[in-house]
Amino acid sequence: MGNSAARSDFEWVYSDQPHTQRRKEMLAKYPSIKALMRPDPNIKWTVLGMVLVQVLACWLVRGLSWRWLLFWAYAFGGCINHSLTLAIHDISHNTAFGTRCASRNRWFAVFANLPIGLPYATSFKKYHVDHHRYLGGDGLDVDIPTDFEGWFFCTPARKLLWLVLQPFFYSLRPLYVNPKAVTRMEILNALVQLAFNVTIFALWGIKAIVYLLASSLLGLGLHPISGHFVAEHYMFLKGHETYSYYGPLNWITFNVGYHVEHHDFPSIPGCYLPLVRMIAPEYYDHLPQHHSWVKVLWDFVFEDSLGPYSRVKRKCKLAKDQL
């Protein structure tokens, strides 16, 4: 468990991200893809159902022992809350109500945020725009680990700890890498979340709150679904910085596994991404892909060639306009 990862720096490149050029080529060749840039008609009802399920779970766990509460938080609540974060990811691209109803999308993301226990949705959108525009951008893409993470989490034991602590790194890293002013919507997100938490505590006590928070921290940490964090952009094969996964866990994660397709067409909802691959298979079938998120986690921990440094990084010029 003591072997150090082989890399001592990121994979620096001097080319633009591949998604921009591929998007232009595909739209020229298959203009019908534009028809997929429309709202997901089902995401509203799916999210509503998941939020209500977690509220019901708060009532059910109020009398459980702490041991069983944490078990169900990992095995059940972790799946629901992680799935909700991926719904928020999809909604951040205005897929619930369309681009003409940006405010509705923002508030619906705040609603989807409720069972997560901590205000997250608005801040996520603020930084996720940069992740797409400046993929791998030094000091801009906060999805890239810090130099400290790459240096310190370099052995199997430390990489395992890094996976457990993923929720904390994803929350705190933006404040260090690319701090931005707090927005009015972020404050409103926090106030709504606080009101929800106080209501849950008043109704069913501290165990309900612990269940929600544990569902988020455990579900976003060392959990099978969390394999997507590593699978999406960590360089398992030199020269490739984005990877897709086409397995069954897409059914509960809003097709986040179709990640190459997503970066090619961020405005297409997850529910339609399989159609992109069907329309233009020659752009995707030859690319390296993952077949198991659990195996991704295993390989990340035990392969010396993999670690937090296994990311493509580039210098990016700031764009004048905003997405």
Curated annotation (Swiss-Prot):
One annotated GO molecular function: sphingolipid C4-monooxygenase activity
EC number: 1.14.18.5, 1.14.19.17
Pathway(s) this gene product operates in, as recorded in its UniProt entry: Membrane lipid metabolism; sphingolipid biosynthesis
Single GO BP term: sphinganine metabolic process
Lipid metabolism in keyword set: yes
UniProt xrefs under CDD domains: Delta4-sphingolipid-FADS-like
Residues anchoring lipid (N-myristoyl glycine): G2
Membrane topology according to the record: Multi-pass membrane protein
SMART domains named in the record: Lipid_DES
Designated name of the protein: Sphingolipid delta(4)-desaturase/C4-monooxygenase DES2
Gene transcribed to yield this protein: Degs2
